[in-house]
Amino acid sequence: MNISYDDLGFFHRLGADGIRLDLGFDGRKEALLTFNPYHLAIELNMSNDVAYLENILTHQANTSFLYGCHNFYPQEGTALPYHFFQSSSERFKKNGIRTAAFITSQSGTIGPWDINDGLPTLEMHRHLSVETAAKHLFATNLIDDIIIGNAYASEEELKSLGHLDRYQTVFRIEFVANVNEVERQIVLEEQHVRRGDITDQVIRSTEVRKKYQKDENKVHDTEFEFVVGDVVVGNDRFGKYKNELQIVLEPHSDPRKNKVGHITPEELILLPFIHPWSKFKFIEK
């Protein structure tokens, strides 16, 4: 094709916005590419946890045109584990490089290879809904852009991504039959903030109890052990803690708390990303 890294005019004439370097060169060449006169973005492969990026940056790359994107993995069992994804992504984020990763449509059947078991970056996402996988990537604060790897995503999948709040986690909750109107309001209509002095047992949203301190909350759904992902609200037995909302992180029992619902099981992977002072909300499944 007679193409050289010294002249990217071929890609410009194609109408491309950028090029991906899956393997790369020696660092100096990549840095020079970021100064191409066509302002084409130069995208690096993020799925290698080595000092490749640092080498490019030592050659004074133009980081305004330098991007990072992970690979996708069509074969079941071959995508990245989370700890490796985290380490390799942090290399880019700490240097202010824009990042991207892939999620997989559960309805798409078309990919670039003859094997297509989905096209995620993370193996843990392979059988998750696009909504939950995207929530997880945004919750890590490591990924700026999300790409659906396979075609074609369903209208429902696209709509769910279109309504996604990328700036805070919104949990889907299934309510128990006995949930009352005050509890529904506390769960669905309030902005929740995890208390800053955290505990291992629960995620506490304490400000809501002040707003609802005068509202009655009769006892219900207290006679069993709460499990991880249960959402509980303090009942009339709980004194000053009445109507405080909590998400259960460790199994325990407490008759002063009503179970009002449970976070959708596949979204339990989001709980570790609710840090001190993190904001979060709920929607009904």
Per-segment meaning from a language model:
Residues 176-285:
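C-terminal functional modules
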Residues 6-7, 17, 22, 26, ...:
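Acidic-enriched, low-complexity/disordered segments with a strong bias for Aspartate over Glutamate
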Residues 7-10, 32-35, 64-68, 109-114, ...:
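Generic detector of short, locally flexible boundary/turn motifs and exposed helical patches
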Residues 45-177:
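Catalytic alpha/beta core domains of metabolic enzymes, predominantly
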Residues 24-27, 55-59, 100-104, 197-205:
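Short low-complexity stretches enriched in small and charged residues
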Residues 15, 39-41, 71-72, 116-120, ...:
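N-terminal start-of-chain detector that recognizes signal peptides
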Residues 12, 70, 83, 125-127, ...:
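Histidine (H) residue identity feature
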Residues 1-65:
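Active-site beta->alpha loop and helix N-cap motifs at the rims of alpha/beta catalytic domains
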